[in-house]
């Protein structure tokens, strides 16, 4: 039988339990992953109690309340607070969500919060997305043309423009890629659902003139074909997009140009 031994500093330990708010009757318990690279200590799970009668309805509201009123050392990303910027993606109650639009009423019992899976951690709930962004850049997510730029806009029919619906709305939160087991196993070479969704968005753009080159760049055993239609990406996308369908469409295009 294979035996695996985790590095000593990877084992999570029980952290600090903060006191409950006095006089509160509607209290939720939050178990939150904590790790500070500057201390050299193991990751830990700290426990906080929040008076929900004095807190907004979203998970991000509770995190902000914890940081402002209980523990200012808690670190996480956030910005727009309305599901547009993608900054506050994290693993909540076992699934990847945007904390700003994930309601407390969707969670039963304790609230368990971790950083996005698979990614290196910068600190606490902040993942290092350097590799994720590099993969996105590798698909050249912009218009490539040889035709001289027109005096006005690049014209596009209503039908061609409609093909981009369900693709351009991605907020680059990384929830889909970090929910994908294939990305966990082959993240160094498999581009992942987010990057491939963007690749398809430009491949089918009627104004783009580099379709062949884009498909050539994806003709690789790992970049595209490590997708095994597990569908975690589609199930977890906070914008309701379907990266798995986009990936399947690219595969069909690969076959169509050969047959």
From Swiss-Prot:
Subunit structure: Part of an enzyme complex containing four subunits: a flavoprotein, an iron-sulfur, cytochrome b-556, and a hydrophobic anchor protein.
CDD domains found in the cross-reference section: fer2
Translocase is among the record's keywords: no
Taxonomic superkingdom: Bacteria
Binding locations of [4Fe-4S] cluster: 170, 173, 176, 237
Name the UniProt record assigns to this protein: Succinate dehydrogenase iron-sulfur subunit
GO biological process: respiratory electron transport chain; tricarboxylic acid cycle
Cofactor(s) needed by this chain: [2Fe-2S] cluster; [3Fe-4S] cluster; [4Fe-4S] cluster
Record: residues binding [3Fe-4S] cluster: 180, 227, 233
Keyword Electron transport listed: yes
Boundaries of every 2Fe-2S ferredoxin-type domain copy: 28-119
Reactions accelerated catalytically: a quinone + succinate = fumarate + a quinol
Pfam family, one: Fer2_3
GO molecular function: 2 iron, 2 sulfur cluster binding; 3 iron, 4 sulfur cluster binding; 4 iron, 4 sulfur cluster binding; electron transfer activity; metal ion binding; succinate dehydrogenase (quinone) activity
Binding of a ubiquinone, residues: 185
